[in-house]
Protein backbone atom coordinates (compact mmCIF):
# COMPACT_ATOMS: atom_id res chain seq x y z
CA UNK A 1 0.00 0.00 0.00
CA UNK A 2 1.31 3.44 -0.91
CA UNK A 3 1.87 5.75 2.03
CA UNK A 4 -0.59 8.59 2.47
CA UNK A 5 0.89 12.07 2.19
CA UNK A 6 0.74 15.02 4.58
CA UNK A 7 1.12 18.22 2.57
CA UNK A 8 1.38 21.72 4.04
CA UNK A 9 0.00 24.34 1.67
CA UNK A 10 1.70 27.72 1.44
CA UNK A 11 -0.36 30.46 -0.19
CA UNK A 12 2.02 33.15 -1.43
CA UNK A 13 1.06 36.80 -1.89
CA UNK A 14 3.40 39.79 -2.18
CA UNK A 15 6.42 37.64 -1.34
CA UNK A 16 5.15 36.15 1.93
CA UNK A 17 2.98 33.22 3.02
CA UNK A 18 -0.62 34.21 3.83
CA UNK A 19 -3.79 32.41 4.87
CA UNK A 20 -7.41 33.39 4.52
CA UNK A 21 -10.78 31.93 5.39
CA UNK A 22 -12.92 30.79 2.45
CA UNK A 23 -10.35 32.46 0.16
CA UNK A 24 -10.81 35.92 1.78
CA UNK A 25 -9.27 38.17 4.48
CA UNK A 26 -5.68 36.94 4.21
CA UNK A 27 -3.25 37.40 7.09
CA UNK A 28 0.53 37.03 6.91
CA UNK A 29 1.85 33.70 8.24
CA UNK A 30 5.59 34.08 7.66
CA UNK A 31 8.45 33.89 5.19
CA UNK A 32 8.34 31.47 2.26
CA UNK A 33 11.77 29.91 2.70
CA UNK A 34 11.58 29.82 6.50
CA UNK A 35 8.25 27.98 6.53
CA UNK A 36 9.37 25.60 3.79
CA UNK A 37 12.46 24.68 5.78
CA UNK A 38 10.44 24.23 8.97
CA UNK A 39 7.93 21.88 7.36
CA UNK A 40 10.61 19.80 5.68
CA UNK A 41 12.39 19.40 9.02
CA UNK A 42 9.12 18.47 10.76
CA UNK A 43 8.51 15.59 8.37
CA UNK A 44 6.10 16.89 5.74
CA UNK A 45 5.96 14.54 2.75
CA UNK A 46 5.61 17.30 0.19
CA UNK A 47 4.87 21.03 -0.05
CA UNK A 48 2.51 22.95 -2.31
CA UNK A 49 3.00 26.64 -3.05
CA UNK A 50 0.20 28.71 -4.57
CA UNK A 51 0.95 32.22 -5.81
CA UNK A 52 -2.68 33.07 -5.24
CA UNK A 53 -2.94 36.29 -7.28
CA UNK A 54 -0.73 35.34 -10.24
CA UNK A 55 -3.59 34.24 -12.51
CA UNK A 56 -5.93 37.09 -11.61
CA UNK A 57 -3.02 39.54 -12.06
CA UNK A 58 -2.15 37.95 -15.44
CA UNK A 59 1.43 37.13 -14.45
CA UNK A 60 3.50 34.04 -13.68
CA UNK A 61 4.66 32.99 -10.24
CA UNK A 62 7.85 34.76 -9.06
CA UNK A 63 10.61 32.22 -9.72
CA UNK A 64 13.23 33.77 -7.42
CA UNK A 65 11.80 32.15 -4.31
CA UNK A 66 11.33 28.81 -6.11
CA UNK A 67 15.09 28.39 -6.44
CA UNK A 68 15.65 29.45 -2.82
CA UNK A 69 13.16 26.85 -1.60
CA UNK A 70 14.84 24.16 -3.72
CA UNK A 71 18.15 24.95 -2.02
CA UNK A 72 16.88 24.43 1.53
CA UNK A 73 14.51 21.44 1.36
CA UNK A 74 14.96 17.83 0.29
CA UNK A 75 11.30 16.85 -0.17
CA UNK A 76 9.21 17.22 -3.34
CA UNK A 77 7.38 20.48 -3.89
CA UNK A 78 4.76 21.71 -6.31
CA UNK A 79 4.30 25.29 -7.55
CA UNK A 80 1.18 26.96 -8.92
CA UNK A 81 0.41 30.44 -10.12
CA UNK A 82 -0.36 31.78 -13.57
CA UNK A 83 1.38 28.96 -15.50
CA UNK A 84 -0.05 29.34 -19.00
CA UNK A 85 2.52 27.67 -21.25
CA UNK A 86 5.06 24.88 -21.58
CA UNK A 87 7.78 27.53 -21.27
CA UNK A 88 6.35 28.86 -17.99
CA UNK A 89 6.33 25.33 -16.58
CA UNK A 90 9.81 24.53 -17.91
CA UNK A 91 11.30 27.50 -16.08
CA UNK A 92 9.65 26.62 -12.77
CA UNK A 93 10.78 22.99 -13.02
CA UNK A 94 14.30 24.13 -13.95
CA UNK A 95 14.35 26.37 -10.88
CA UNK A 96 13.86 23.25 -8.77
CA UNK A 97 10.16 22.46 -8.43
CA UNK A 98 9.18 18.80 -8.84
CA UNK A 99 5.67 19.48 -10.14
CA UNK A 100 3.59 22.31 -11.49
CA UNK A 101 -0.06 22.82 -10.70
CA UNK A 102 -2.49 24.61 -12.97
CA UNK A 103 -5.95 25.80 -12.11
CA UNK A 104 -7.46 28.90 -13.73
CA UNK A 105 -5.20 28.67 -16.83
CA UNK A 106 -6.38 25.08 -17.42
CA UNK A 107 -9.99 26.23 -17.34
CA UNK A 108 -9.20 28.92 -19.90
CA UNK A 109 -7.19 26.51 -22.08
CA UNK A 110 -7.81 22.80 -21.28
CA UNK A 111 -5.30 21.80 -23.95
CA UNK A 112 -2.57 23.17 -21.67
CA UNK A 113 -2.95 20.06 -19.49
CA UNK A 114 -2.16 17.83 -22.47
CA UNK A 115 0.78 19.93 -23.66
CA UNK A 116 2.38 19.87 -20.22
CA UNK A 117 1.79 16.13 -19.78
CA UNK A 118 3.31 15.36 -23.19
CA UNK A 119 6.36 17.52 -22.50
CA UNK A 120 7.12 16.71 -18.86
CA UNK A 121 5.15 13.53 -18.09
CA UNK A 122 1.87 13.21 -16.22
CA UNK A 123 3.73 12.83 -12.91
CA UNK A 124 4.70 16.52 -13.12
CA UNK A 125 1.23 17.85 -13.90
CA UNK A 126 -1.23 18.60 -11.11
CA UNK A 127 -4.64 20.17 -11.74
CA UNK A 128 -6.04 22.20 -8.86
CA UNK A 129 -9.82 22.54 -8.73
CA UNK A 130 -11.56 25.19 -6.63
CA UNK A 131 -14.96 23.65 -5.95
CA UNK A 132 -17.90 25.47 -4.40
CA UNK A 133 -21.12 23.84 -3.25
CA UNK A 134 -24.04 26.00 -4.36
CA UNK A 135 -26.82 25.28 -1.87
CA UNK A 136 -29.40 26.92 -4.15
CA UNK A 137 -28.78 24.54 -7.05
CA UNK A 138 -27.39 21.56 -5.14
CA UNK A 139 -24.42 21.46 -7.53
CA UNK A 140 -20.66 21.49 -7.01
CA UNK A 141 -19.39 24.28 -9.26
CA UNK A 142 -15.83 25.03 -10.37
CA UNK A 143 -14.65 28.58 -9.64
CA UNK A 144 -11.91 30.50 -11.44
CA UNK A 145 -9.53 33.32 -10.37
CA UNK A 146 -10.20 32.61 -6.70
CA UNK A 147 -7.02 34.36 -5.50
CA UNK A 148 -8.74 37.73 -5.91
CA UNK A 149 -12.22 37.93 -4.43
CA UNK A 150 -13.23 40.76 -6.76
CA UNK A 151 -12.35 38.72 -9.86
CA UNK A 152 -13.58 35.27 -8.82
CA UNK A 153 -16.09 33.83 -11.27
CA UNK A 154 -18.21 30.71 -11.54
CA UNK A 155 -17.39 28.60 -14.59
CA UNK A 156 -19.76 26.44 -16.62
CA UNK A 157 -18.11 23.30 -15.24
CA UNK A 158 -19.61 21.05 -12.61
CA UNK A 159 -16.82 19.68 -10.44
CA UNK A 160 -17.20 15.99 -11.27
CA UNK A 161 -17.27 16.72 -15.00
CA UNK A 162 -14.11 18.84 -14.79
CA UNK A 163 -12.31 16.17 -12.74
CA UNK A 164 -12.98 13.67 -15.52
CA UNK A 165 -12.04 16.10 -18.29
CA UNK A 166 -8.77 17.04 -16.59
CA UNK A 167 -7.79 13.37 -16.26
CA UNK A 168 -8.67 12.68 -19.87
CA UNK A 169 -6.37 15.50 -20.92
CA UNK A 170 -3.40 14.24 -18.90
CA UNK A 171 -3.63 15.39 -15.28
CA UNK A 172 -1.41 13.15 -13.15
CA UNK A 173 -2.93 14.32 -9.88
CA UNK A 174 -5.99 16.27 -8.73
CA UNK A 175 -6.06 18.67 -5.78
CA UNK A 176 -9.65 19.35 -4.74
CA UNK A 177 -9.87 22.70 -2.94
CA UNK A 178 -13.27 22.82 -1.24
CA UNK A 179 -14.05 26.51 -0.94
CA UNK A 180 -16.95 26.22 1.53
CA UNK A 181 -14.71 24.48 4.07
CA UNK A 182 -11.52 26.50 3.49
CA UNK A 183 -10.01 27.77 6.74
CA UNK A 184 -13.06 26.72 8.79
CA UNK A 185 -11.26 23.82 10.52
CA UNK A 186 -14.47 21.79 10.65
CA UNK A 187 -13.24 18.87 8.58
CA UNK A 188 -12.83 17.98 4.93
CA UNK A 189 -15.95 17.67 2.77
CA UNK A 190 -16.06 13.87 2.87
CA UNK A 191 -19.25 13.63 0.86
CA UNK A 192 -17.78 15.58 -2.04
CA UNK A 193 -14.44 13.78 -1.78
CA UNK A 194 -16.17 10.40 -2.04
CA UNK A 195 -18.02 11.54 -5.17
CA UNK A 196 -14.79 12.78 -6.73
CA UNK A 197 -12.88 9.65 -5.66
CA UNK A 198 -15.41 7.52 -7.55
CA UNK A 199 -14.48 9.21 -10.84
CA UNK A 200 -10.83 10.09 -10.11
CA UNK A 201 -8.40 7.37 -11.17
CA UNK A 202 -5.24 9.41 -10.48
CA UNK A 203 -3.95 10.47 -7.05
CA UNK A 204 -6.46 12.71 -5.27
CA UNK A 205 -5.45 15.31 -2.68
CA UNK A 206 -8.00 16.72 -0.22
CA UNK A 207 -7.78 20.43 0.57
CA UNK A 208 -9.91 22.69 2.74
CA UNK A 209 -11.20 22.25 6.26
CA UNK A 210 -8.61 20.38 8.34
CA UNK A 211 -8.89 21.32 11.99
CA UNK A 212 -8.14 18.15 13.96
CA UNK A 213 -6.15 14.97 13.56
CA UNK A 214 -9.40 13.04 13.11
CA UNK A 215 -10.13 15.06 9.98
CA UNK A 216 -6.97 13.76 8.31
CA UNK A 217 -7.78 10.18 9.33
CA UNK A 218 -11.33 10.44 8.00
CA UNK A 219 -10.17 11.82 4.65
CA UNK A 220 -7.73 8.91 4.30
CA UNK A 221 -9.96 6.11 5.57
CA UNK A 222 -13.46 7.20 4.53
CA UNK A 223 -12.77 9.07 1.28
CA UNK A 224 -9.62 7.14 0.31
CA UNK A 225 -7.67 10.23 -0.70
CA UNK A 226 -3.94 9.88 -1.39
CA UNK A 227 -2.86 13.04 0.36
CA UNK A 228 -4.26 15.64 2.72
CA UNK A 229 -3.34 19.26 2.29
CA UNK A 230 -3.70 21.80 5.09
CA UNK A 231 -2.52 25.29 5.92
CA UNK A 232 -3.73 27.15 8.99
CA UNK A 233 -3.42 24.23 11.44
CA UNK A 234 0.25 23.89 10.46
CA UNK A 235 1.08 27.60 10.12
CA UNK A 236 -0.37 28.35 13.56
CA UNK A 237 1.16 25.31 15.23
CA UNK A 238 -2.21 23.80 16.14
CA UNK A 239 -1.24 20.37 14.82
CA UNK A 240 2.47 19.47 14.88
CA UNK A 241 3.30 17.27 11.89
CA UNK A 242 5.37 14.67 13.83
CA UNK A 243 2.52 14.16 16.31
CA UNK A 244 -0.03 13.95 13.50
CA UNK A 245 1.95 11.26 11.71
CA UNK A 246 2.43 9.20 14.86
CA UNK A 247 -1.27 9.45 15.67
CA UNK A 248 -2.31 8.47 12.15
CA UNK A 249 0.02 5.48 12.23
CA UNK A 250 -1.56 4.35 15.51
CA UNK A 251 -4.96 4.71 13.82
CA UNK A 252 -3.85 2.25 11.14
CA UNK A 253 -3.17 4.75 8.36
CA UNK A 254 -0.19 3.89 6.13
CA UNK A 255 2.01 6.91 6.70
CA UNK A 256 5.71 7.76 6.44
CA UNK A 257 7.22 8.71 9.79
From Swiss-Prot:
A single GO BP annotation from the record? L-histidine biosynthetic process
Provide any one GO MF term from the record: lyase activity
Keyword Cell division carried by entry: no
One cellular component term (GO) for this entry is: cytoplasm
**Keyword field:** Amino-acid biosynthesis, Cytoplasm, Histidine biosynthesis, Lyase
In this protein, the active site sits at 11, 130
Q: Which reaction does it catalyse?
A: 5-[(5-phospho-1-deoxy-D-ribulos-1-ylimino)methylamino]-1-(5-phospho-beta-D-ribosyl)imidazole-4-carboxamide + L-glutamine = D-erythro-1-(imidazol-4-yl)glycerol 3-phosphate + 5-amino-1-(5-phospho-beta-D-ribosyl)imidazole-4-carboxamide + L-glutamate + H(+)
* EC assignment: 4.3.2.10
Compartments in which it is found:
Cytoplasm
Q: In which pathway does it act?
A: Amino-acid biosynthesis; L-histidine biosynthesis; L-histidine from 5-phospho-alpha-D-ribose 1-diphosphate: step 5/9
Predominant location category: cytoplasm
Q: Which InterPro entries match?
A: Aldolase_TIM, His_biosynth, HisF, IGPS_HisA/HisF, RibuloseP-bd_barrel
Provide the top EC class.
lyase
Q: What does this protein do?
A: IGPS catalyzes the conversion of PRFAR and glutamine to IGP, AICAR and glutamate. The HisF subunit catalyzes the cyclization activity that produces IGP and AICAR from PRFAR using the ammonia provided by the HisH subunit.
UniProt family annotation: Belongs to the HisA/HisF family.
| PANTHER family registered for this protein in UniProt | IMIDAZOLE GLYCEROL PHOSPHATE SYNTHASE HISHF, IMIDAZOLE GLYCEROL PHOSPHATE SYNTHASE SUBUNIT HISF/H IGP SYNTHASE SUBUNIT HISF/H
Q: Name the HAMAP family on file.
A: HisF
The UniProt subunit note reads as follows: Heterodimer of HisH and HisF.
Official protein name in the record? Imidazole glycerol phosphate synthase subunit HisF
This chain's source organism reads Aeromonas salmonicida (strain A449)
Amino acid sequence: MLSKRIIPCLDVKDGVVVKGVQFRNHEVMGGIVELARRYAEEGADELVFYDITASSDARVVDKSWVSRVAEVIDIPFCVAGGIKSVEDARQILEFGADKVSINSPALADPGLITRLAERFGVQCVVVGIDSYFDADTGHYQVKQFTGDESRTRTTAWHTLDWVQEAQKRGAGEIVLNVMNQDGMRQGYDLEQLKLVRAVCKVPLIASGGAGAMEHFRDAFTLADVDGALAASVFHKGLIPIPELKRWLKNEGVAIRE
